[in-house]
A protein has these predicted regions:
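N-terminal entry segment of cytoskeletal motor ATPase domains
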Residues: 1-161
């Protein structure tokens, strides 16, 4: 098992997948020789993993009245590893939340479409304030830099990187 860790039956995990990169799974049994898991894609089938295959713990999905709960900041994730980060970004992307914090850094995903209301005047006004917002948005990043100049007389830098 990864790092000689033992896993209990029912443990929610991520396993490598050829097409999807990572796939959600649940441990059926685990011992020193093999780990048997089941997945939503193959509920009747079982996948047998070698003990040295990469496995990452997964948190139970949280649902609210609006649907799947998606964290505004990746540092709030219970497990901070590649599959958890990619899943969180995908879940946010699926509901048109293209901005996500990772600590003080803003991650922006290309939505490949127009998202109505994303840059409206009302949205802009909601970020123009002396109080910092906790919502991830490019307007928030701009306002924080502006406030740093005006309130603290400190030089500010906004680094933009992408393809």
């Amino acid at each position: 098992m990864s790092g000689m860790t033992t896993y209990a039956q029912g443990t929610l995990i991520w396993i490598k997948h050829e097409e999807e990169v990572w796939m959600q799974a649940e441990i059926v049994t685990a011992n020193e020789k093999e780990i048997i898991v089941k997945t939503a894609e193959e509920p009747d089938g079982r996948i047998i993993l070698a003990p040295n295959e990469p496995i990452f713990l997964r948190t139970t999905d949280l649902f609210t009245t609006e649907g799947l709960s998606v964290m505004d900041d990746l540092t709030q994730l219970d497990h901070l590893h590649e599959p958890a980060v990619l899943s969180s970004l995908q879940n946010r992307f699926d509901v048109d939340k293209i901005y996500t914090f990772t600590g003080p850094i803003l991650i922006a995903l290309n939505p490949f479409k127009v998202i109505p209301g994303l840059y409206d005047d009302d949205v802009l006004r909601s970020f123009i304030s002396t109080k910092p917002s906790t919502k991830p948005h490019v307007f928030n990043t701009s306002n924080m830099a502006y406030r740093g100049i005006c309130d603290r007389s400190k030089s500010q830098t906004v680094l933009i990187s992408g393809e």
